[in-house]
Amino acid sequence: MSMLNHFFDYKPEVLALDEKALELCQPYFKQMEDIRDYNQLKMLKAFADTQMSSTDMLGTTGYGLWDSGRAKLEQIFAEVMGAEDALVRSQFQSGTHTLAVALFGLLRAGDTLLAATGRPYDTLEGVIGLDGKGKGTGTLMDYGIRNDEAPLKADFTPDYELIAQKAPGAKVCHIQRSRGYLQRNAFDLDTIRKVADTARAVNPDIIIFVDNCYGEFTQKEEPCQAGADLVVGSLIKNPGGGIAPTGGYIAGRKDLVELCAYRLNAPGLGKELGCTLETPRDMYLGFYYAPGVVCEAIKTAIYAQCLLELVGKKPIPRYCEAHNDIVTCFDAGTADALIGFCRGVQAASPVDSYAAPEPSPEPGYTDEVIMASGSFTQGSTIELSCDGPLREPYTCYLQGGLNFAASRAGVLLAVQNAYFKD
């Protein structure tokens, strides 16, 4: 009997699929483990270079002036990200908040934001003010900032000719690495570099801005090493390692990071303020563990993609393709299958496993969304979770997995719940 059946009730045909998937995935697991090892050594070197000490994890209160722990963490982030400077703060509430702070820090009235990889993720629509969303609440467009887009081509690749036409009038070129609610693979660093080169060829002063959410540590380099001036991400995704309880980061050119710090705090204050309270240890430890945790999440993705192919689905990316973020998307086919898959993930979660997810309205989203996340950190997507909008073709987005052993059990239960009901 499979070890899995000592703890969960799987059907024989589902266990047979598990065995086949594990066999097929082994060479792709090894590729990801090589990336993990490289990134972990890079991380270790950055910690050593910074001479971080145990007292740097104690935290500060009040203004947070002269916080050496905060400064060293930002130095480590900058080195690992291939950046000049970084802003790493628990005051960032989410990825969307971090992105908003960065965009407001860079753009002024009359400037143009060019979305070079098509319309951004749903939650940014309200930040920008697209289609009148958030009008009057202080969106970019409320402040006289213009928005332009270069839609992706039919094959979900950037339209480089259109980018070249639109970039001369733009202040910031926005690249979204991950897919949002599109059925495309995340962009690799070569694509990011080509978008950056295309925009700079016609506008040398344009700021290349990359939403790096879900993409950290999936390759051996980061977007700042592929032409980005500024990258932004969330600590409850990849770089927090499942340990950081909140926060976000902005990394890149020193002058641009400083502008973002003025926006987060206040003009004249910049990076000098921001107490860390009791968060430094978790942020240090989470970032240190992040390369290994991301590897576990991608191994989970590879396994899930293989398993889904074996039941006739067409996940993006395929298990045998390059992985540039931790997300897998596939068409569940029906609302029942989408709901069943999410409930299976929830049932094999360490937290709130007894809950049964239901579709519901979510702020920033057009359709009802169903979400499964039995995570230790609310909203964490480096922990095994899945979600999808209740609209045809009922696409499911699966991400995360702190360790492969537990995540494998969750994915297998989700597939059984969606496609092997009695």
Labelled PLM ranges:
Residues Y63-G69:
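N-terminal small-domain helix-loop-helix segment of the aminotransferase-like
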Residues T60, L87-S90, I326-D331:
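Short glycine-rich or small-residue beta-strand-to-loop segments that form or flank ligand, phosphate
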Residues L4-Q26, E33, K42-D56, L65, ...:
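Conserved PLP-enzyme active-site core in the AAT-like
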Residues A71, F77-G82, S90-Q91:
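Extended, compositionally biased flexible segments
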Residues E309-K421:
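Conserved C-terminal alpha-helix-loop-beta "cap" of PLP-dependent enzymes
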